[in-house]
Amino acid sequence: MSRVLVTGATGFVGRGVLEPLLAAGYDVHAISTRPAPAWSPEGVVWHQTDLLELGATSLVSELRPAQLLHFAWDAEPGRFWISEGNLHWVEASLRLLRAFAAAGGERAVLAGTSAEYAWEHETHCVEGVTPLAPATLYGASKHALRMIAEAHARQHDYALAWGRIFFVFGPFEDERRLGGSVASALAVGRRAETSPGKQVRDFLYAPELAEAFAALLGSDVTGAVNVASGQPVAIKELICALGEAAGRPDLVALGARAANPLEPASLTADVGRLRDEVGWTPTRSLAEAARETMAWWSHR
C-alpha cells in the first residue's frame, strides 16, 4: 500500500480527494492546521501542523510518503490574487519538496492554475503551446514554483506532475466565489444578482476535480496537465443551471451587476493530456452537477 501525504486536505478541492485515494488503495495521510475534522472518511490519518512554520517538514521525514499531493495555498476569495501569502507558500512548498525528496519520495502532484497562462481577449489554453505570462502575483508565484519544482524533481529523480486548475464549483464553495454566491442565495430564497454572464469559461464540478487529481497521481504522466472539463460554457449557463436545480429560476438576476471589463471574453482549456494520457474525463452533466450542488446547499 503506497503512502500518500495530502496537503490542503480540508480545503474546497483537497477534501474531495480523500475518498478517491482510499478507494484506490492508498495509505492516506492528511495535513491540517486544525484537529481531524468530524467529516473525515474512515481510514485517513490526520496530522495537525502548519506548513508555513519552518519546522513543519519534519513530519515528512517521519512519514516518508512515497506520494505527495499538494493543494495547500492562500486561496481567500478576492485576496489571493495579490496576497503576500503567495510568496510564503512558494517558500513553504519548496521546503516541502526538499523534505519529500530527502525522505525518498517517488511522485509528487502539485496544484497549479490557469492564471499561469497569458490571458488574452480569447484564450484556449494548451499545455506547452499557449504562452505562460501570468498577470498576477498569484499566477506568477505558481508559475515560478512549477519551474523550480520541475528542475528539482529532475535533479533528485522523482516524478512530478502539475495539475492546472481552471474554474470550479460545487459543495463547500466559499460564498464569496461565483458558484457559492449564487447557490447560497438560491438556497434561502434570495435573489441571485450577477453580471450578464456572457464570458465563456471551463467549469469543473469540485468532486470531479478531486477525482481527476487522484487519477493524475495514480498515472505516470509528468509535467503540466490542464485539469478541466473540456466543455466550455457561458457563465450564465452555470448560473441558470443552479437556478433550475433550486427550482427558482425566477430568482436569477442576470445583468444586475456589471461585468468586469478586464476579464477575458473566453478562457478555455485543452484537455487532451488529461483525457488521453491520464485517462480521465468527467461523467456528470452541468445540470447533474448543479442539482448535486443545490442539494448540498439546501441541507447544509
Feature names for model-found ranges:
Residues 4-24:
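N-terminal Rossmann NAD(P)H-binding glycine-rich loop of SDR-like oxidoreductase domains
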Residues 41-53:
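Rossmann-fold cofactor-recognition segment
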Residues 51-88:
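NAD(P)H-binding glycine-rich loop region in Rossmannoid oxidoreductase-like domains
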Residues 70, 94-137:
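Conserved Rossmann-fold NAD(P)-dependent oxidoreductase catalytic core, especially the SDR/UDP-sugar
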Residues 77-92, 126-134:
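Short alpha-helical oligomerization interface
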Residues 122, 147-202, 206-210, 239-246:
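NAD(P)-dependent short-chain dehydrogenase/reductase
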Residues 137, 141-144:
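Active-site helix of classical SDR
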Residues 186-300:
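C-terminal substrate-binding subdomain of Rossmann-fold SDR/epimerase-dehydratase oxidoreductases
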